[in-house]
Amino acid sequence: MSENNGKQFINGQRVAANAPTIESINATDYQPTGYLFSQATLDEVDQAAQAAYQAFLKYQHTTQQQRADFLDEIAIQIENLGSKLQEVAAQETGLPLVRLQGETGRVTGQLRLFAELLRRGDFYGARIDTALPERKPLPRVDLRQYKIGVGPVAVFGASNFPLAFSTAGGDTVAALAAGCSVVFKAHSGHMATAELVAQAIEKAILNSGIPSGTFNMIFGSRVGANLVEHPLIQAAGFTGSLEGGMALFNLAQNRPQPIPFFAEMSSVNPVIVMPEALNARGEKVAQDTVASFNMGCGQFCTKPGLIIGIKSPAFDQFVTALIDTTRTAVPQIMLNQGTLKSYQQGIDALLNEQGFKCIASGQAPELISQAQPHLFQADQSVLLSGNPKLQHEVFGPMSIVIAVDDEATLLNGLEKLAGQLTATIIADESDLPQAKELLNLLTRKAGRVLFNGFPTGVEVSDAMVHGGPFPATSDSRGTSVGTGAIERFLRPVCYQNTSQVLLPDVLKDGNPLHITRLVNGVLTQN
């Protein structure tokens, strides 16, 4: 394994005009880890985009099998990093080794899942309408459509998942699977981790015969805007704050050539607890709820940050159980000093906001890098008025509980909520007749609606949706988890009256790739 040198990854080379001055910081004590990195220059941003463009011109013509083998090889090379990867990531993020071991498996599993998607071939969306020269009153020409990669993609690493939403995370894998090249902007919170994974990707490129420049990575806090504005970048993926996401989104839309910008940003992920479920198992639901909003120190974008139920003795007992469980919750290390500061500011803002009160706090922190869990209660008027403080995601181990008068008030209040990544209904069988209207409402509000589970687990699969209406994401038509994520980096192209000699294999007569296609309105592999 290569030693840390802190240089950019551009066109298969390590380059740096600036001396390595950006320090990687230990998340536990805020001391330097010893890893140093170079701030990318504007010229290096341009070099990375140029390299990605030149690579795309070749990489877009690789076969689905070649790309699948490439993704499999990345998975192998990441596994070959061994425990060193988790150890460095733990140092930079404060996350437990067991969590990072699971996250490594998530990354390699995701790579292999996309490889399966490529071999299956349905991502092409192949549609063929053969010519009907005798059709009256007008003949029909031969039309054949499939999807191709949009071009070089900029990807921004997320702070809270140093592996799964980072260098070889969902956005990168989806773009590579689509036939797009990538310029990855490493997150400042785990640059050494990113460097290790980028080295693995570079080895996979060499071993697979993939064009150099298919993957590039740059470091630095002042290059994101330049990357999004670069004319050769054709799409971008982002996971982070609402403020950061919208700033980059606006840059992407204000370019001379606007580009798709897929940002996952802000969600409070409401959990609705139904009356009969509380009567049957209220204490267990409370314990599971607190465990969910404290998981990973509350640093999940799917953390349940809002808990709502209808006033009743059972709901009062449920709140008491929430309080008791929260008080036993232990402090955990947050990802970095900036994240902890933002969390504390969010807590202070709620403490000073009318209609909110803190009703329970977890055990006091023992380290300067730890966050204390909190449970707030808010008046139903806060929900009914659409108070922005209620809808502002406080990233960390906290949640807000609200009791409403009745079902009509519940539905009225939920209408005031903005878009969400998830919405959860905790219900028993006898609650289901009342849940239908609630389900319809939440379906309009969220990308994923759960029953009797908690949203902090996000399965990587074909059916998963990790997205939702604004401000959960900048574009509710996509997902950043699961094989559907590839759709964000594809565009359709149609060939009309084109010779079989010139057509791509995916559209040729005889179906040489043996994939499922829509031919004259019929799904077939013929």
From Swiss-Prot:
GO biological process annotation, one example: D-glucarate catabolic process
General function of this protein: Catalyzes the NAD(P)(+)-dependent oxidation of alpha-ketoglutaric semialdehyde (alphaKGSA) to alpha-ketoglutarate in the D-glutarate degradation pathway.
InterPro entries registered for this protein in UniProt: Ald_DH/histidinol_DH, Ald_DH_C, Ald_DH_N, Aldehyde_DH_dom, Aldehyde_DH_Superfamily, ALDH_KGSADH
Domain of life of the organism encoding this protein: Bacteria
Protein residues bound to NADP(+): S159, N160, K185, A186, H187, S188, G240, S241, E393
Catalysed reactions, semicolon-separated: 2,5-dioxopentanoate + NADP(+) + H2O = 2-oxoglutarate + NADPH + 2 H(+)
EC number: 1.2.1.26
Organism: Acinetobacter baylyi (strain ATCC 33305 / BD413 / ADP1)
Name of the protein: Alpha-ketoglutaric semialdehyde dehydrogenase
Gene Ontology molecular functions: 2,5-dioxovalerate dehydrogenase (NADP+) activity
Keywords of this entry: NADP, Oxidoreductase
Source species taxonomy: Bacteria, Pseudomonadati, Pseudomonadota, Gammaproteobacteria, Moraxellales
